[in-house]
Structure formats: C-alpha cells, structure tokens
C-alpha cells in the first residue's frame, strides 16, 4: 500500500474518532473503490469506503462507475442493502457517480438502502467554467430525490452517529489545480 494511501486512511480515522467525546470500541474501514485493485476486484478512478463504528455503518463516497462499488461489495460478501446512510465528501463524479445506480438497485431489496445522503451545504451549487455549469452532481439531485433520497446538509462539525463526525465545510483557500 503506498504511503499517500496509508496517510489518507490515517487521516480519515483521525477525523472519525479524533473529534469524539467517547471512545470507539470497534472501527472498521473497507475500501470498495479506488485506483488499486487485484484478484476479483474492480479498480476505477474514484473512491468509496464503508465506515463501521460500534454498530453504525455509513458509505463514504460512491465511486465513479455504476457497478464498481456493488460488484466489489459482492466479491467481499458485503450486503450494501443494510447501509442506509451515505456521506458524500465533495461533488466530483469520481466520488458521486455510483450513487444513482446504488440507490436504484438496492432500494428494490430494502427501501431504506442508501436513502439518507449527507452532504455539505452548497454541494449542488453551480460551478461555472466558460459560462457552463461543471458541477455534474447538480444534475443528479432531482433524480436522487425522485428515488426517495433525503439529503442531510452539514455546514459545521456535527456528529452523524456516536463517534462519527463530519468536519463540515472545509473552506477552499486555493483554486483547484487538476
């Protein structure tokens, strides 16, 4: 595992348990989508992970492809239909692209699967470049709401579940360079 990826996981764990008033007894993070894959797993330009903490589960991002997260979960014998909450880190399609297909497929098994989607306030705002909206996630909002998704907006640090927190909106200091 490369150093950058290890540092990311360490940072994510610090965010999850670092702001807590209690102590997490059981924490597990399972990566379902990343650029690195082998054996029976699919890789893609995207990210998704299940965070499990003391009996609570939340899907952190949904990858970019329609099938990557669900196929990798199936390969790991993970039942995604029992995960009701999704946390979207930001609006890029490599972190949100799988959400519509996950909701469509899993709601037939469990109507609450992937139903509650935690997002930062302003995630659906237009991002204009040369007069065009380049925020692809904006176009997904109506589709997701028609599938029964309820968005939960966060602006400041908040506890989502016991010992699972969001930092809230992280201000952008510099324009994106990629």
Predicted regions and their residues:
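Metallo-beta-lactamase
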Residues: 120-178
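Bacterial Sec-dependent N-terminal signal peptides
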Residues: 1-24
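Conserved beta-strand hairpin/beta-sheet module of binuclear metal-dependent hydrolase folds
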Residues: 28-75
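Active-site metal-binding motif and surrounding structural segment of the metallo-beta-lactamase
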Residues: 67-118
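N-terminal-biased segments
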Residues: 23-37, 93-101
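Active-site environment of divalent metal-dependent phosphoester hydrolases
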Residues: 38-39, 66-68, 93-96, 124-127, ...
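Beta-strand-turn-beta hairpins that frame and shape the catalytic cleft
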Residues: 25-27, 53-57, 158-165
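Active-site metal-binding loops of divalent metal-dependent hydrolases
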Residues: 34-36, 62-64, 91, 121-123, ...
